[in-house]
Regions:
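Juxta-kinase regulatory segment immediately upstream of eukaryotic protein kinase catalytic domains
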Residues: 1-44
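Conserved ATP-binding subdomain of kinase catalytic cores across diverse folds
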Residues: 27-138, 167
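Short helix/strand-bridging catalytic loops that position acidic/His residues to coordinate divalent metals
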Residues: 74-79, 145-150, 195-201
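Conserved kinase catalytic-core helix
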Residues: 91-112, 140-184
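Catalytic activation segment of kinase domains across protein kinase-like and atypical kinase folds
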Residues: 174, 178-201
Length: 201
């Protein structure tokens, strides 16, 4: 059991594999999650970091960039709670609770939350590889939205959402235009990629 600020993450170990999910959805998803480990779809190799599972879910595979790309998708293992999939899952869960418990009605109606379904870690001696399965968010990244000018006052709305993040102690050290999704149909914004987030609320 891994504690978050507002709940906990349940982990199951199978040989060298760990499957982890929100304790509050355990009765609903446990069987489906465990069954997914044997699915051909889940074992598809990821060449582009993100893989659309075509069922309302997105699989994010963690891989290195920059000078560390020689390690590819291998990371040093310092305990399950310190792995990147668990860290991102925990941050998503805490952020969801902050938004849901907020009294700021404009923000709660404007933000569409990306839900972490479960995370998956494979350990091999000193290293691990990992994935996280997230609910699929419809829309386009903010850089494409700004280029198309889909919404005139989008900058102001993004600024108000940033203010909400800072007021609640949510700091994303990897925030950029590709980590913000705008859905023109619902007129909602979503923040994604919570791997490098610190929450001090």
């Amino acid at each position: 059991m891994i504690k978050t600020k507002f709940g906990s993450i349940v982990s199951h170990k199978f040989n060298n594999q760990y499957i982890c999910y929100d304790s509050s959805i355990q009765p609903i998803l446990k069987d489906r999650i465990l069954a997914s480990l044997d699915s051909d779809e889940f074992r598809l190799s990821n060449t582009s970091n993100f893989l659309d599972l075509n069922n309302g879910l997105i699989k994010k595979h963690f891989c290195r960039k920059g000078a560390m790309h020689l390690f590819n998708d291998n990371y040093f293992y310092y305990g399950l709670k310190n792995t990147r999939p668990i860290r991102e899952q925990k941050n998503h869960m805490d952020f969801m609770n902050i938004v849901k418990n907020s009294k700021n009605e404009w923000v709660t109606s404007k933000l569409e939350l990306c839900m972490p379904i479960f995370s998956y870690v494979i350990r091999s001696n000193l290293f691990y590889k990992g994935d996280i399965i997230l609910s699929k968010i419809t829309g386009e990244t903010l850089d494409k939205t700004l280029m198309k000018r889909l919404k005139i006052n989008i900058e102001e709305e993004v600024g108000l959402c940033f203010r909400f993040l800072f007021d609640n102690g949510v700091y994303n050290f990897d925030m950029n235009l590709t980590n913000i999704i705008y859905n023109p149909e619902s007129d909602k914004l979503s923040f994604i990629d919570f791997d490098k987030v610190t929450i001090n609320s």
